[in-house]
Amino acid sequence: MPPALARPLLSSLPKGVTLGYTRGRTDERLPSGSDSLDRVLRGGFPRGRLSEVFGGASSGRTSLACRLLAATTARAETAALVDCRDRFDPRCGRAAGIRLARVLWVRPHDEREALRCCEILLGTERLALVVLDLADGLSPIAAARFSSAWPRLAHQAAAANVTLVLISRERLAGSFAALCLALRGGHALWPRHALCAPLFAGIASRAEVVRAREGTLTRRQAALSP
């Protein structure tokens, strides 16, 4: 039943009966921007779900976030980046293919404000993607505060059919994440050119699926180029 028709009906029902939401289609995927990863994930990150990407320094977290934002905006969809440590560089983002006009860049002052920003963004139901970048993770106090927020954020993402992706150094959302990827840095790439010395081109990394709630994956690892 459409919400506009359901609300008048709810007013006549006993207290405690609330307006619910249907979950987003579980077969819908949001491309990650990496062909090798999308083949493993059968199309990309699940829409309407909370997904988690974690890894140490130089593991490719930022690169994957930029690829995801670039792939989303290239499809003429709108995304939001909640940048908890104010590390996003718009010039690098543009060079990575992100259409900045389709990205809402939010720079909260602390973790508490970042959480509130995510709740507001998911409540708009106008976005295809929300990336919550917690950079180097959370303090023990903040982690305890967020532990009760993950089920709420997962529910909001499902209600709005928004892909919510958490980026952090360590795993935080646990079983509330429908998809969890572990990133590990690999070897440095030094392509050789005929007329000059080798130039550093980045660090290759690998993504491993450590949790996938929906469906059985035949492959669980993917190589990610810089």
Name each model-derived stretch.
Residues 56, 67, 75-141:
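Conserved inter-motif catalytic segment of the P-loop NTP-binding fold
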Residues 1-81, 95, 215, 226:
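Detector for small/aliphatic-rich hydrophobic stretches
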Residues 144-152:
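Charged helix-capping and loop-helix junction motifs
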Residues 51-53, 80-82, 104-106, 165, ...:
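Hydrophobic/aromatic beta-strand patches that form the interior of the parallel beta-sheet core
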Residues 71, 92, 156:
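Hydrophobic/aromatic ligand-binding patch that stacks against planar heteroaromatic rings
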Residues 154-226:
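Phosphate-binding/switch region of NTP-binding enzymes
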